[in-house]
Amino acid sequence: MEAERRRQAEKPKKGQVGSSLLPERHPAAGTLTTMVDSSAPPCRRLPGAGVGRPRFSPQGGQRGRPHSRRRHRTTFSPVQLEQLESAFGRNQYPDIWARESLARDTGLSEARIQVWFQNRRAKQRKQERSLLQPLAHLSPAAFSSFLPESSACPYSYAPPPPPVTCFPHPYSHALPSQPSTGGAFALPHQSEDWYPTLHPTPAGHLPCPPPPPMLPLSLEPSKSWN
């Protein structure tokens, strides 16, 4: 009985490692534990530490993000703006020679002047679109409100008269001409009974008027007044 108790006491419990077995089976385990125990306690890591921080390369530059170029804003003087606006009013698309000439006058670089003209044209197009945008939403009925009403118009136009149909004159013979006496112009004698009697015509139709009398031409040379 005593021998069995000794055997059970010598057997290690489940889940525990005997201290006598460590040096024999794992001789380096003791040194490892002593090194861990003798080291300083581990630093406590703050929550979120190191998250979202950019990494830097050994050369000192930021890794993973390209360097963004910083834009320099040019400030124009009132005199320069006046010269640029005057040139823009003459020509909105100046060539290289016009830009170089303007650069000498204003003291700016040709590249700055080219960028200014591009921005100025974009600004003008934006202003034109803003002016045309309210008119695009108007309906045709809204446009009629801008027109004057017919009652307010000071002028009134009468409707055109109906067309009149002319019938040929019943007398188609030529008028009798009288011989000229003394070489002077002689008007033909027109009697009162020369005009024909108007015959009744259908309603809405009038006869054509008679042709005008023809005057004879004189062949004698014109007399001088001297």
From Swiss-Prot:
Residues 1-75, 181-226 are annotated as: Disordered. SMART domains: HOX (SM00389). Gene3D superfamilies: Homeodomain-like. Residues 64-74 have a biased composition (Basic residues). Residues 216-226 have a biased composition (Low complexity). One of its GO terms (molecular function) is DNA-binding transcription factor activity, RNA polymerase II-specific. Keywords: DNA-binding, Homeobox, Nucleus. It comes from the Eukaryota. It is found in: Nucleus. Residues 69-128 bind DNA. Possibly involved in the ontogenesis of pituitary gonadotropes, as well as somatotropes, lactotropes and caudomedial thyrotropes. Belongs to the paired homeobox family. This is Homeobox protein prophet of Pit-1.
